[in-house]
From Swiss-Prot:
Pathway info: Carbohydrate degradation; 2-deoxy-D-ribose 1-phosphate degradation; D-glyceraldehyde 3-phosphate and acetaldehyde from 2-deoxy-alpha-D-ribose 1-phosphate: step 1/2
Pfam family, one: Metalloenzyme
Name of the protein this chain belongs to: Phosphopentomutase
Xref: InterPro entries: Alkaline_phosphatase_core_sf, DeoB, Metalloenzyme, Phosphopentomutase_DeoB_cap_sf
Membership in a protein family: Belongs to the phosphopentomutase family.
Annotated coiled-coil segments of the chain: none
GO biological process: 2-deoxyribose 1-phosphate catabolic process; 5-phosphoribose 1-diphosphate biosynthetic process; metabolic compound salvage; nucleotide metabolic process
Required co-factors: Mn(2+)
Major subcellular location class: cytoplasm
Length: 410
C-alpha cells in the first residue's frame, strides 16, 4: 500500500535563493531570522519564550537543511540531533514567489510564464475591469483599489464597507485580486458570487488568484478575518502528479485546507476544509486514518498549513510564527507514528515570508525538503534545483509516467 503525506508549512523558507536579488530578497531567511530573534529573547510572548525549540523537525534534518542552504546553523536549533529522515533544500524554478507557483512546482509543474500583476500602488485596477465587475454584480461601487495589508485595509475601510455595502478591492505584490466583505452585512454567499464574477472577468489579465477575504466584527480594531477564505485559482498549465495519480492509477488525493483551491480542484478526489493549525492537524490525521482503514493504495493526503504565512509571515509576527512552529513540531510525532511500512511523509514549503523582512510580502527563498518513512534512508538530499524534484519523486514512488521537470531523490 503506497501512501504519501505532504505537509506544506506555508511560507517556511530556509534561506535566500540564488536569484533573490531579482526580488529584492537578498539575505532573507524565514527560519534563520525567527531562530535568531528567539535566541536573543526578542520573540517571547504569552505562548513561548527563549530559543526556538524544534526537536522533531531537527531529527528529520531541518537544522542540517538550513545549514546546507545558508552555510550556518540557525541559532538555538539542535545541530547534533540524531537524523532519522532524508533532508535537503530546493530552489524555485518558477518565475514568481507566490502560492500557486510554489505548489504547482512541488507537484511537478513549474510556472515558467510571467503572471499578470497590478503594479500601481494606488488606482491599481483598470476602470474597464472594475466597471464590468460592478455591472455584473449589480453593485453601486467599491472601496480600496490599491495595494494593502489585508488586516490594515479592514481598519481603514471596514466600517465604510458596512455602511455602504460596497466591497473592498485590493491587491499586493502577488498576482492576486482580493475582495474583502463582511460576512453578516454583505453575506458570504454574495462575496463568493462576486469573486466568481471577478475570476471570469480577469481571464485576459493572467492573474493567478481571486481571493475571497470574509471578515466579521462590529468596527475598527475589532474586525477579524474568518476561516471561510476561498482562493479561486486558474488551472495548472499541465498535469500535476496529483492529476496523474488519479488518471493513471485510479488513485485518491485528499486535500486538507486550501490545497484544492490552489490546484483549482484538478487532481483532487476529496477535500476537507479546516481553519487553524490544530484543526488542520486533526483533519490530516483523520484523513490518514481513513486511508489506512480503507486500505487506500495510491493515496496522497495533502495539507497546507496556511497560518504560518497569513497569520504570522505577512503580519511580520516573529513570536507568533515561532510559537506556531513549536506547536507544529510538538504534534508532528502524532502523524509520524501513524505511518505504515510503505508510507512516506514529506514536509516542505511553497516560498518564504520572512517576518523580520521589510514590507509584508513573500520572500524568494529555498524551501526545506524533509522526507520520512520506514523505508527512507536517513541522510542528505543536498541542493535540489527545483521544487519539482518532489513531484518527480512521487511519480517514481507511485509508478506513474514521468513528470517533465525534476529529478527523483528516491
Amino acid at each position: 500500500m503506497k501512501r504519501a503525506i505532504i505537509l506544506v508549512l506555508d511560507s517556511f523558507g530556509i534561506g535566500a535563493a540564488g536569484d533573490a536579488d531579482k526580488f529584492g530578497d537578498v539575505g532573507s531567511d524565514t527560519m534563520g531570522h525567527i531562530a535568531e530573534q528567539c535566541d536573543k529573547g526578542l520573540a517571547d510572548n504569552g505562548n513561548r519564550k527563549g530559543p526556538l525549540t524544534l526537536p522533531n523537525l531537527s531529527k528529520l534534518g531541518l537544522a542540517m537543511a538550513g545549514k546546507e542552504s545558508t552555510g550556518k546553523f540557525s541559532a538555538g536549533l539542535d545541530a547534533n540531533a540524531e537524523i532519522i529522515g532524508a533532508y535537503g533544500h530546493a530552489a524555485e524554478l518558477s518565475s514568481g514567489k507566490d502560492t500557486p507557483s510554489g505548489h504547482w512546482e512541488i507537484a511537478g509543474v513549474p510556472v515558467l510564464f510571467d503572471w499578470g500583476y497590478f503594479t500601481d500602488k494606488e488606482n491599481s485596477f483598470p476602470k474597464e475591469l472594475t466597471d464590468r465587475i460592478l455591472e455584473r454584480a449589480n453593485l453601486p461601487g467599491y472601496l480600496g483599489n490599491c495595494h494593502a495589508s489585508g488586516t490594515q485595509v479592514l481598519d481603514d475601510l471596514g466600517e465604510e464597507h458596512m455602511k455602504t455595502g460596497m466591497p473592498i478591492f485590493y491587491t499586493s505584490a502577488d498576482s492576486v485580486f482580493q475582495i474583502a466583505c463582511h460576512e453578516e452585512t454583505f453575506g458570504l454567499d454574495n462575496l463568493l458570487t462576486l469573486c466568481q464574477i471577478a475570476r471570469e472577468e480577469l481571464e485576459d489579465y493572467n492573474i493567478g488568484r481571486v481571493i475571497a477575504r470574509p471578515f466579521i466584527g462590529p468596527g475598527k480594531g475589532q474586525f477579524e478575518r474568518t476561516g471561510n477564505r476561498r482562493d479561486l485559482s486558474v488551472e495548472p498549465p499541465a498535469a500535476t502528479i496529483l492529476q496523474k495519480l488519479v488518471d493513471e492509477k485510479g488513485g485518491q488525493v485528499h486535500s486538507i485546507g486550501k490545497i484544492s483551491d490552489i490546484y483549482a480542484g484538478c487532481g483532487i478526489t476529496k477535500k476537507t476544509k479546516a481553519t487553524g493549525i490544530p484543526a488542520l492537524f486533526d483533519a490530516t490525521k483523520e484523513a490518514i486514518e481513513q486511508a489506512i482503514e480503507q486500505a487506500g493504495d495510491n493515496t496522497i493526503v495533502f495539507t497546507n498549513f496556511v497560518d504560518f504565512d497569513s497569520a504570522y509571515g505577512h503580519r511580520r509576527d516573529v513570536a507568533g510564527y515561532a510559537a506556531a512552529l513549536e506547536y507544529f513540531d510538538g504534534r508532528l510525532p502524532e502523524i509520524m507514528d501513524m505511518l505504515q511500512e510503505d508510507d512516506i511523509l514529506i514536509l516542505t514549503a511553497d516560498h518564504g515570508c520572512d517576518p523580520t523582512w521589510p514590507g509584508t510580502d513573500h520572500t524568494r527563498e529555498h524551501i526545506p525538503v524533509l522526507v520520512y518513512g520506514h523505508k527512507v534512508p536517513a541522510g542528505s538530499l543536498g541542493r535540489r534545483d527545483t521544487f519539482a524534484d518532489i513531484g518527480q519523486t512521487l511519480a517514481e514512488y507511485f509508478e506513474t509516467s514521468d513528470m517533465e521537470y525534476g529529478k527523483s531523490f528516491l
